[in-house]
Amino acid sequence: MAKKEVKKIVLAYSGGLDTSIILKWLKNEYGCEVVTFSADLGQGDELEPVREKAFKTGADKVYIDDLREEFVRDFVYPMFRANAIYEGSYLLGTSIARPLIAKRQMEIAKIEGCDAVSHGATGKGNDQVRFELAYYHFNPGITVVAPWREWKLNSRQALINYAKRNDIPIPITKKRPWSSDRNLLHISFEGGILEDTWLEPPENMFVLTKAPEKAPNKPQYIEIEFEKGNAVAVDGVRMSPAELLAHLNTIGGEHGIGRVDLLENRSVGMKSRGVYETPGGTILREAHMAVEQITMDREVMHLRDSLIPRYAEMIYNGYWFSPEREMMQCMIDESQKTVNGVARLKLYKGHCRTVGRKSESDSLFNLDFATFEKDQVYNQADAEGFIKLNSLRLRIRSLMLANKNK
C-alpha cells in the first residue's frame, strides 16, 4: 500500500526515543491519523507520562491497556510449564511479550478501522519478526509500516538530531548509555556501552536486583505451590499470576537473583549481547522443575525436555501463534496435569537452590522402593537380568570387534 493510501495507523508506542520519533515521522511522512497503543506489562512508573507525551508528539488517539494478568496467565505461565530457556541462559522475557502486544494492537486496529500497523523495531533485531509474524496471523492482508526499514535515520545521532528538530524530548543520557525494555518477567539491557563484550555491566545499570555481594547475609526460605504446572501460592498465600510473579521479583531482587549476561544468536543471523534481570522468573523455573522431579514420569519428562530447545526457539523467533507451537503446547500441558505440589527454595546472595519438594496427590517417590535401608518390595537380584538384557548389544559389538581384530 502506497503512503498516500494509508489513512490510519496504530503504532505500538513505548514513549521512548525510537517510538516518539516514529510517531512524529508517521505524521510527517504519511500525513495520516495515528493511534498509539501502549501495553502495561508491568513497567511501573514508565507509563505515567506516556499519554501526555503521545498527544504532544501528534497522536490522534491514545490507548494504554493493563495487560499484566493476561501476560502472565496466558503467555508467561504456558512458557514456564515447558521450562523454556533459550541457549541455556535466556528466559525469553522480551520474546514472550511481543505476541501479546501485537495481538492487542491488531484488536485496536480493527476497533479503530486502521488500515496499517507500525512498530519501533529495528531492521537488525528480532522484534520486527516477532511483531510482524503475529500481525499476519491475525490479518494476512494488513499493511505494516516499519520505519527503521524505510527512513534514512540510520544512527542514534541521526535520531537525536531529528528529535531536536521536532522538539521531541530525548530520554537517553550519557549517564545511562544503553537501552532497556521492562515487563513483569524481566528487564533487558542492550546497546551503547554493552556492545563492548569485554566490559562488565556497571552496577548502576541494574534496577530489579541487588548486587549479590550486597544481598542479605542470612538466607531466606520460601515455599511455592503448583497446580497443574502453574504457581498458585507463595508461603501459603494464594495470588493471581501477575501478583505472584511481582512478589517473587521483589523477593528475588533483594537476594540478587536472576542476573544474566549473554551473547545470543538473533533470528536474523548476527550475535548480540543482552544483559537481563529476571529474579521472579528464575525462582519460578527452579521451583517448577523441583515439583516436576517428584511428580512427572521419567519418559514423559525426558521426551518433553528433548523438545524444549525447539520450543524456546519458536518463542524467540516469533512463532508463538504458529501451529507447531500450539501443537507442542498441548503436549506440554498434558504432561503438567500431575505437576501438583510444593517446592522449598533457599535464596542466598544470587543463588536460588531447591532444598525440598513434596506432593500429597501425585508423588512418584515411593520410599518402599527407593530406600537404601532394608526393604521388602524390591528384589535386588532382579537387577542382574535387567543389566544383562540391556548390555546385550554392547556384548555383541564387543564380540564382533574381537573377531574382527584376530
From Swiss-Prot:
Compartment(s): Cytoplasm
**Binding positions for L-citrulline per the UniProt entry:** Y90, S95, N126, R130, S179, S188, E264, Y276
InterPro entries assigned to the protein according to its UniProt record, in alphabetical order: Arginosuc_syn_C, Arginosuc_syn_N, Arginosuc_synth, Arginosuc_synth_CS, Arginosuc_synth_type_1_subfam, AS_cat/multimer_dom_body, Rossmann-like_a/b/a_fold
Which reaction does this chain catalyze? L-citrulline + L-aspartate + ATP = 2-(N(omega)-L-arginino)succinate + AMP + diphosphate + H(+)
Q: In which pathway does it act?
A: Amino-acid biosynthesis; L-arginine biosynthesis; L-arginine from L-ornithine and carbamoyl phosphate: step 2/3
EC class, as a word, reads ligase
Q: Which GO terms describe its molecular function?
A: argininosuccinate synthase activity; ATP binding
**Sorted alphabetically, which keywords does the UniProt record give?**
Amino-acid biosynthesis, Arginine biosynthesis, ATP-binding, Cytoplasm, Ligase, Nucleotide-binding
Instruction: Write out the residues that bind L-aspartate.
Output: T122, N126, D127
* Gene Ontology process terms (BP): argininosuccinate metabolic process; L-arginine biosynthetic process; urea cycle
Chief location of this protein within or outside the cell: cytoplasm
> Which protein family is it in?
Belongs to the argininosuccinate synthase family. Type 1 subfamily.
- Describe the protein's quaternary organization and the partners it interacts with: Homotetramer.
The name of this protein is: Argininosuccinate synthase
Per the UniProt record, the source organism is Citrifermentans bemidjiense (strain ATCC BAA-1014 / DSM 16622 / JCM 12645 / Bem)
